[in-house]
Design a protein with these regions (language model features):
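Tandem amphipathic alpha-helical repeat scaffolds
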Residues: 2-11, 36-51, 70-88, 110-127, ...
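Helix-turn-helix repeat elements of alpha-solenoid scaffolds
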Residues: 7-25, 44-60, 83-97, 121-136, ...
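Solenoid-like repeat scaffolds
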Residues: 25-33, 60-71, 97-109, 135-147, ...
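Small side chains
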Residues: 59, 79, 288-291
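Linker/hinge segments immediately adjacent to helix-turn-helix/homeobox DNA-binding domains
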Residues: 132, 147-187, 191-282, 298
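Helix-turn-helix DNA-binding segment
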Residues: 265-316, 320-336
């Protein structure tokens, strides 16, 4: 690695630099020689396993680190862990710590990292990014491949939120095809984004294939946090692919979904002016998401392995909870 980038192993997804084999994340973390990078990687591993309290505790000492890689990583870990812990003020402070504008004297690599982390902090909350993709493109080559892959996820997620599902999928699949190394965490993000786009394009087989690839990465190390966080956007894939075959994992994932989404909405809703529903079960929310995308009750039933009557009853319950009467009204309460 070039001298100017020596600090970059301490980026978000630090363990990816060591290209660990799924099932060996602990060995990869233990093998990181720099103690600060190893601590951040430990916090990441804890976070991706759904251990928000320990992740935040481990990363917190680096919130004011002078090394921008350590600081940005700690802010993102603590910020998102705080959502699951319902510490909304802490989440806001940590995520705001990423948004400090870099000075002109900072290197292109640091500037690129700042744009990426600031964009991730916003886009993952479904809020406008403070930077455009065009501002990032000239600097992207200064990042190592693992972070460039994560950047592809962030940009693909932004395209998804704009309803550009084909472009979103193309960006993800191009990143996966063109990568040189193996970066499990970034690849997990990318496969989840591809699943989201495929579901919105109603290419269910492709969505399940990408979700299966994500699960193959996540399951050996118990990296279930991201799957739980993406629940609504995955539009029933978790239920269709995991509920019967992996009931214990499914239960833990749904627990993460409830915990994370509650905190997520407490920032997203007031900051966006939207009113994403907060009193639906995960099953109700999934069915409502699919209904908003134009799925019939019969299609929803086949996808989720239930009867059309069950779907009808669940959606009636959703309308009653939200005080609405039509699918057109439902859209205002769903994720984009």
């Amino acid at each position: 690695m070039e001298d100017g980038l020596r600090w970059l192993p301490a980026h978000s997804h630090a363990v990816d630099v060591h290209r660990f084999v799924p099932g060996q994340i602990d060995a990869a973390v233990a093998g990181i020689s720099d103690p600060d990078s190893r601590t951040i990687a430990t916090a990441e591993a804890l976070y991706f396993r759904g251990q928000a309290t320990l992740a935040a505790k481990t990363a917190r000492p680096y919130l004011d680190a002078t090394d921008p890689a350590l600081r940005y990583s700690a802010c993102l870990i603590c910020g998102y862990a705080s959502l699951s812990l319902n510490r909304i003020a802490d989440a806001r402070r940590c995520l705001a710590g990423i948004l400090d504008t870099p000075t002109d004297e900072e290197s292109p690599a640091v500037h690129a990292m700042h744009i990426l982390f600031a964009s991730a902090a916003s886009v993952l909350l479904h809020l406008p990014s403070p930077y455009s993709a065009e501002e990032f493109y000239p600097l992207a080559a200064h990042l190592p491949e693992g972070l460039r892959l994560f950047a592809s996820y962030v940009m693909a997620h932004a395209l998804y939120l704009r309803g550009e599902y084909g472009r979103s999928l193309g960006m993800v699949e191009n990143a996966l095809i063109m990568k040189q190394g193996s970066y499990p965490i970034s690849e997990l993000f990318l496969h989840l984004a591809a699943s989201m786009a495929c579901m919105s394009l109603k290419d269910i087989d492709a969505a399940k294939a990408h979700f299966g690839a994500a699960w193959d990465i996540a399951r050996p190390d118990g990296l279930i946090e991201l799957i739980g966080e993406h629940h609504g956007l995955l539009q029933g894939l978790i239920e269709a692919c995991l509920k019967s075959q992996y009931p214990d994992d499914f239960a833990r994932i749904i627990e993460i979904t409830y915990r994370f989404s509650y905190g997520w909405r407490r920032i997203h809703n007031p900051d966006s002016g939207e009113d994403v529903a907060d009193d639906l079960t995960t099953t109700e929310f999934t069915m409502a998401m699919l209904a908003c995308r134009g799925w019939t009750n019969a299609e929803i039933a086949r996808h989720m392995g239930v009867s059309p009557g069950t779907v009808k009853n669940r959606l009636s319950g959703v309308y009653a909870k939200l005080g609405i009467g039509t699918r057109a009204e439902l859209i205002a309460h769903m994720l984009r």
